[in-house]
């Protein structure tokens, strides 16, 4: 059966109640977007506005997706050889919006060109994870991280239907950028139990990623909100809600030293915790690069990071090495 027809059949069979929001984000033609929750979304928060796609604003050079209340996943099948490997993509946006192209579809284009199935998760925003309240100069930590629920659910669905979707249930990883990098760490350390009441058989499947990639992650360093004098005297402690163990999946980290949104301490704190726990971890730090560069080409050395990731994937995930 043709790959697209296979995904379409699975979508109709499993998510017959799906209907796209007229003004919300839609994938390009040929890609199937599916709701991940068959009925009511757990811990749903009423949104005063419908989902929308906004134009770039300020210094941002990419559009944003706002007010997501019905999370979805979109499949991007491999171009050419199917390695069986799958990567779920978590776009960034500070848990306030989603950078669905810069840190979403463009990432999927790169992954699928390397024989990897890509699943782009449109998780709930805003307020679905830790976020910075600029008006009141404070970081807000919601009681329930609904983005984590969406990530756990997606990994369970992929494993439940791995045979139908031609993916290896033991080669499912995650990649996230900025707030999405925090979501990578969250789902990598919160897989023993679901953070929502189980819905169906998919929630009996493991939601542990087999490998993880966090690119300029945020909300990981325990001391990021302290004053400068205190921060300079503190250690690289990880936030207590990110509990690294020896079972945390192998991880790839990347950050720039001049990142003025999420300081380099974010990756350093996570690296130290992973290293102490004996988790295989590779970290790349560059002097320059800033924040929010995605995979777009540039003149700085950090623009070559996808090559480093490709090498790491080839040595970490069996079957990817050409």
Task: Identify the function of each model-found stretch.
Residues 23-81:
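N-terminal cap/lid segment of alpha/beta-hydrolase-fold proteins
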Residues 83-92:
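Short beta-strand element of the alpha/beta-hydrolase
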Residues 91-96, 257:
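Active-site glycine-rich loops that stabilize anionic/oxyanionic intermediates
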Residues 94-103, 120-146, 188-192, 196, ...:
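Cap/lid segment of the alpha/beta-hydrolase catalytic domain
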Residues 101-119:
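Short amphipathic alpha-helix adjacent to the substrate-entry channel of hydrolases
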Residues 149-236, 240, 246:
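Primarily recognizes the serine-hydrolase "nucleophile elbow" in alpha/beta-hydrolase
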Residues 253-255, 259:
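Short beta-strand/loop motif that positions the catalytic acidic residue
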Residues 264, 268-322:
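C-terminal catalytic histidine-bearing segment of alpha/beta-hydrolase fold enzymes
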């Amino acid at each position: 059966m043709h790959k697209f027809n296979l995904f379409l059949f699975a979508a109709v069979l499993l998510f017959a109640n799906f209907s796209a929001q007229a003004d919300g984000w839609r994938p390009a033609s040929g890609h199937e977007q599916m709701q991940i929750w068959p009925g009511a979304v757990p811990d749903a928060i009423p949104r005063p506005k419908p989902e929308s796609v906004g134009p770039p604003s300020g210094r941002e050079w990419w559009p944003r997706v706002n007010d997501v209340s019905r999370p979805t996943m979109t499949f991007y099948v491999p171009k050419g050889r199917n390695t069986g490997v799958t990567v779920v993509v978590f776009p960034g946006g500070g848990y306030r919006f989603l950078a669905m192209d810069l840190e979403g579809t463009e990432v999927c284009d790169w992954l699928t060109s390397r024989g990897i199935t890509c699943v782009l998760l449109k998780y709930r925003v805003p307020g679905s994870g830790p976020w910075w309240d600029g008006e009141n100069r404070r970081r807000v930590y919601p009681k329930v991280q609904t983005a984590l629920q969406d990530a756990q659910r997606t990994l369970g669905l992929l494993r439940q239907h791995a045979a139908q979707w031609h993916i290896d249930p033991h080669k499912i990883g995650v990649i996230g950028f900025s707030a999405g990098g925090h979501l990578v760490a969250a789902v990598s350390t919160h897989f023993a139990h679901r953070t929502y009441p189980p819905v169906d058989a998919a929630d009996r499947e493991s939601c542990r990623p087999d490998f993880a990639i966090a690119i300029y992650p945020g909300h990981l360093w325990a001391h990021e909100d302290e004053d400068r004098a205190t921060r300079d005297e503190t250690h690289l402690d990880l936030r207590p809600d990110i509990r690294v163990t020896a079972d945390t999946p192998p991880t790839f980290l990347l950050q720039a030293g001049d990142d003025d949104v999420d300081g380099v301490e974010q990756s350093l704190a996570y690296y130290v915790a992973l290293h102490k726990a004996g988790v295989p971890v590779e970290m790349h730090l560059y002097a320059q690069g800033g924040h929010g560069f995605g995979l777009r080409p540039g003149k700085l050395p950090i623009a070559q990071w996808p090559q480093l990731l490709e090498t790491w994937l080839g040595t970490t995930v069996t079957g990817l090495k050409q």
